């Protein structure tokens, strides 16, 4: 099976997250929050997974002691190449993965911040990928 372009795949994850909130989120405009925590959690997991697709494509992280890399491994790899991206990845981890994905923070401002960070990370990563991987 041919490996999909990481930028397109990350965008697909972002679209899935948007669709999850749009279709199931039951947004309350008076409270400026989504009604169901489980859909915010799903959207957060979609967003963060999309970012991991990009990070894995740009910064293949190998660990000797653990079977899977953790956020510190990604931050260390990103820090060597781009400090702005490091700040976005740190904020994205806190917003998409922790606040949305685990805590299920239902505030629209938090969810909007997660989508904004995802878009910024994709934008920077698209400039870093070789032309054959970036349409």
Predicted features, each with a name:
Residues 1-37, 127, 135:
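Charged alpha-helical initiation segments
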Residues 16, 49-53, 120:
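Alpha-helical scaffold segments in carbohydrate-active enzymes
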Residues 25, 32-33, 41, 96, ...:
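Generic, low-specificity signal for short hydrophobic/alpha-helical stretches with a mild N-terminal bias
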Residues 34-37, 41-42, 108-112:
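Short, charged, amphipathic alpha-helical segments
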Residues 39-62:
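Hydrophobic alpha-helical packing segments in soluble, helical-rich domains
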Residues 55, 59-135:
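Long, charged low-complexity segments
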């Amino acid at each position: 099976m041919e490996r999909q372009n990481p930028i397109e795949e990350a965008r697909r994850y972002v679209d899935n997250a948007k669709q999850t909130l749009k279709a199931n989120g039951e947004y309350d405009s008076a409270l400026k929050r989504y009604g169901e925590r489980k859909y915010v959690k799903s959207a957060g997991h979609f967003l963060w997974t999309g970012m991991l697709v990009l990070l894995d494509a740009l910064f293949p992280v190998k660990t000797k002691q653990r079977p899977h890399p953790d956020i510190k491994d990604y931050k260390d790899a990103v820090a060597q190449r781009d400090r702005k991206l490091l700040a976005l990845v740190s904020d994205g981890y806190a917003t998409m993965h922790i606040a949305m994905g685990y805590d299920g923070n239902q505030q629209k401002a938090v969810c909007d911040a997660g989508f904004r960070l995802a878009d910024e990370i994709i934008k920077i990563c698209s400039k870093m990928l070789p032309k054959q991987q970036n349409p």
